[in-house]
Regions:
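Charged, low-complexity
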Residues: 2-91, 164
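C-terminal accessory region of SF2 helicases/translocases
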Residues: 14-15, 19-23, 34-41, 52, ...
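SF2 helicase/translocase NTPase motor core
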Residues: 47-73, 80, 90, 102-107, ...
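Conserved Helicase C-terminal RecA-like lobe
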Residues: 63-71, 97, 105, 109, ...
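Pre-Walker A (Motif I) flank of P-loop NTPase domains
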Residues: 88-92, 115, 193, 418-419, ...
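Inter-lobe coupling linker of SF2 helicases/translocases
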Residues: 142-174, 178-191, 196-199, 215-359, ...
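A short beta-strand element within the Helicase C-terminal
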Residues: 211, 496-507, 533-536
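Conserved SF2 helicase motif VI
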Residues: 512-529
């Protein structure tokens, strides 16, 4: 349905579409149409199919001269595809593997749009981005993630607020919709284009990726591709196997292998260091008997109600890090008990400020998002006195003893000298290791600050001393030369520290994405070293079992594989490359190979090793590839891409009339299911919690009343509202609607109309339930 109507019969536009049955017969709609179709050369058909399946503006090879001269050859295809995705969908995600130069690609894409743009980056990366802008004489406002996290959100400078393109660096930080920063960004980018940049979009689950898409996509935008609702998909209510093929339309996520394999010009020589991943070191911060006793004692703590398991998990994490970190967490836990008792005596719950005093955000970011709402909901009952006694016993057990884990680290540093970064989860551990290793030319960074063994320093000073080449600095004076850098994960994002040749995961993080970010500081294009190494420390068995850390990592790795992450790290090193999203990149190459593409509806028959057909079909406004093989039809753009590539070199075959017809008949059932899914997403879904599902009947009822009055202007307004609600909403549009519905005053049509007018136009892509065969390729085995 179109976004508005001004005729006196506008009410029919409102009431009709949700009553329209799925078109029949589909076989007729899917057959080549008259002069537009017909047999054509296989290369031309494959080119037409590839261009259509990319589902964006015409993607012609513009050549290097169309892009800034500082863009490397392997970065140009990424920039071209991102520009096309932005033009088609209003947003895109750049998730190339670490070290391929995503910042340069993002800047080139922003400049190509020839409109003011704003950078949204972590505060620690502002100097790096300012340097990049200055290097290429580019002026752009920068706002920080931290400013969006503030309560209330700090207003943007006027020059930034006027921007219609936002480049979000380290975009994975916006994966959680329950955070202030996600809500602030969602509102900020309404009606603007959004370029998300991160090598690790999936940290914990596939929903991370979908929440990023919701910043610029409406909820039903991918229904024709098998994802009827992005919001329902985040809840696990959509088949995960359909998400990656749909997501590929929005993502450039190239593995290093894909980039090195080259494009039309042949392989590209990229100089990455050779990886050497040592066997994990299993060691505890105390003898096994002490660790086992501490694990048992932590298991006896019961304060926190339903949050007690999470509180115990935090203590166990710190025990896995170091005894100093564990003792600091015991002190925080006891402070939490004090506050809970005080709040209970006052008949109230903990305040957010009190919670943050007990659990500093920088120390427990990954857990705090879960703990915060759960703990604040506790009724305030005083903890059992047994917890006090158990904490005292744990403090006594955690007194200074031999640190087997730190001993193992020292042996490692002695055995293989070289610049090394040691990553830890806990600031207390970083301080402890710096003190213990102070004679090894060590320094540390935590948060915005840093420290040499001799005293305090700025973060910038420490990084320049440790990695002068990567930071573009002169060699430090001998007194500040640094071979060992101890850091928390705040250092793991965005920075180039490739003077170093080894990363030590002293603590295993919550997410494999953190492992990739850490290694990415040194595993970069143009490294100074032929080879680099990683070493992971794992907790001893009793503690490992209590943490179930490796099982958690395995589950998150499975989510990364499902999402097609370009780089996946495990505790034992790189898992290998996941090329699940590379097929769109290969399509771009196919689209440029041939000269003129075949007309819409054309088909070709070629020889191959199987009996199969590829049907490129536009339905519900989007394009998908259906592969028919063995009498079964499946939506499979990955397999379709391989078959289209085969068509460029395959021998033509004689066409037998029934072959294409049979494929169309088999595919019709799947197409019918997809069309029904689009229709259900708009009108018949049973998701009763959605605003749209409650409001559409209300607006339709108002439309009937307006029709009886003959109020054409009111009907036009209601028509536009139904179109808006039926199309689903972005996360920001939904937040604005929530503001309207949360007012105390009764809801009126005028309120909804005002909300609708604040939003960008729906556009002309809403083509309802039309079906069109774009191209068909039949593969016949040699007889």
């Amino acid at each position: 349905m179109r976004s508005s109507s001004t005729s006196a019969t506008a009410v029919h536009s409102i009431l009709a579409e949700h009553l329209i049955p799925v078109p029949e017969p589909l076989v007729v709609a899917l057959r080549p149409r008259g002069e537009a179709g017909g047999e054509a050369p296989a290369r031309a058909v494959a080119s037409r199919a590839a261009r259509a399946l990319l589902d964006g503006p015409a993607l012609e090879a513009a050549g290097p001269e169309a892009w800034p001269p500082w863009l490397a050859p392997h970065q140009i295809p990424a920039a071209e595809r991102l520009s096309a995705i932005l033009a088609r969908h209003g947003g895109a995600l750049l998730a190339d593997a670490v070290g391929l130069g995503k910042s340069y690609v993002a800047l080139a894409v922003a400049l190509a749009h020839d409109e003011p743009f704003c950078l949204v980056v972590p505060a620690v990366l502002v100097p790096q981005w300012r340097g990049l802008l200055a290097r290429f004489d580019v002026d752009a406002p920068i706002t920080t993630h931290e400013s969006l996290s503030a309560t209330p959100c700090r207003p943007l400078p006027p020059v930034a607020a006027r921007c219609r393109l936002f480049v979000i660096d380290e975009a994975h930080r916006f994966r959680n919709p329950d955070t202030n920063r996600h809500r602030a960004l969602a509102r900020l980018v309404i009606g603007a284009r959004v370029l998300l940049v991160t090598a690790t979009p999936v940290h914990n689950r596939l929903a991370d990726l979908l929440h990023l898409f919701r910043l610029f996509l409406r909820d039903h935008a991918l229904a024709a591709l098998g994802v009827p609702s992005l919001r329902r998909a985040t809840l696990g209510e959509v088949d995960a196997s359909s998400i990656a093929p749909a997501a590929a339309r929005l993502v450039v996520a190239r593995s290093r292998g894909r980039v090195q394999s080259g494009y039309a010009g042949g392989p590209i020589a990229l100089s990455f260091p050779r990886r050497s991943d040592a066997e994990p070191v299993r060691a505890g911060s105390a003898p096994d008997s002490v660790v086992e006793a501490l694990v048992t004692g932590v298991g006896r703590l019961t304060a926190g109600g339903t949050a007690a398991p999470l509180l115990r998990l935090m203590l166990l994490r710190r025990l896995a890090s170091s005894l100093p970190a564990f003792r600091a967490s015991l002190a925080r836990h006891e402070a939490y008990l004090d506050l809970v008792e005080r709040a209970a005596a006052d008949g109230r719950r903990l305040s957010p400020r009190e919670f943050q005093r007990c659990f500093p955000r920088a120390e427990t970011l990954d857990v705090q998002l879960v703990l915060f709402p759960v703990l604040l909901e506790q009724a305030g009952a005083a903890p059992v006195t047994g917890d006090r006694r158990e904490l005292a016993r744990l403090r006594a057990l955690a007194s200074d003893t031999r640190d087997l884990k730190a001993d193992a680290l020292e042996r490692l540093l002695d055995a293989v000298p070289g610049k090394t970064i040691v990553f830890t989860d806990a600031r207390a551990t970083a301080r402890y290791l710096l003190q213990r290793l102070r004679t090894r030319r060590a320094a540390a960074v935590f948060g915005a600050g840093g420290r040499f063994a001799a005293g305090e320093a700025t973060r910038h000073e420490v990084l320049r001393a440790f990695a002068p080449a990567a930071q573009g600095a002169s060699p430090p004076p001998p007194a500040l030369e640094t071979d060992l850098l101890i850091a928390t994960d705040l250092l793991s994002e965005g920075l180039n520290l490739q003077d170093a040749e080894r990363v030590v995961h002293y603590d295993v993080p919550w997410s494999p994405a953190r492992l990739a970010q850490r290694v990415g500081r040194i595993d970069r294009l143009g490294s100074l070293h032929e080879g680099i190494a990683t070493v992971t420390f794992l907790p001893p068995e009793p503690l490992a079992a209590a943490l179930a850390l490796e099982e958690r990592l395995a589950a998150k790795i499975r989510a990364q594989v499902a999402a097609g992450s370009a780089q996946i790290e495990t505790a034992r090193g790189a898992l290998g490359e996941s090329p699940a999203l590379d097929w769109c990149d290969r399509l771009s190459e196919l689209a440029r190979r041939a000269g003129d593409a075949a007309p819409i509806g054309a088909w070709a028959v070629v020889r191959g090793d199987r009996d199969a057909a590829v049907l490129i079909i536009r339905l519900g406004g989007l394009v998908d590839a259906i592969v028919v093989e063995g009498g079964i039809a499946r939506a499979d753009p990955v397999a379709a891409t391989r078959l289209l590539a085969h068509a460029f070199t395959a021998e033509p075959a004689a066409h037998t009339a029934p072959t294409l017809g049979r494929a169309v008949e088999v595919a019709a059932s799947l197409v019918r299911q997809r069309l029904a899914a689009v229709q259900d997403a708009r009108w018949r879904a049973t998701d009763r919690d959605r605003f749209a599902r409650r409001l559409i009947p209300w607006v339709l009822s108002a439309g009937r009343r307006a029709a009886r009055r003959g109020d054409a202007p009111q009907l036009a307004t209601l028509d536009a509202l139904v179109s808006r609600l039926a199309s689903g909403m972005t996360a920001g549009e939904e937040l604005l609607l929530e503001d309207v519905l949360s007012r105390r005053e009764p809801l009126t049509v005028r309120d909804l109309a005002a909300w609708h007018e604040r939003l960008p136009p729906l556009g002309s892509d809403d083509v309802g339930f039309d079906v069109e065969l774009i191209a068909a390729l039949v593969i016949q085995p040699a007889t």
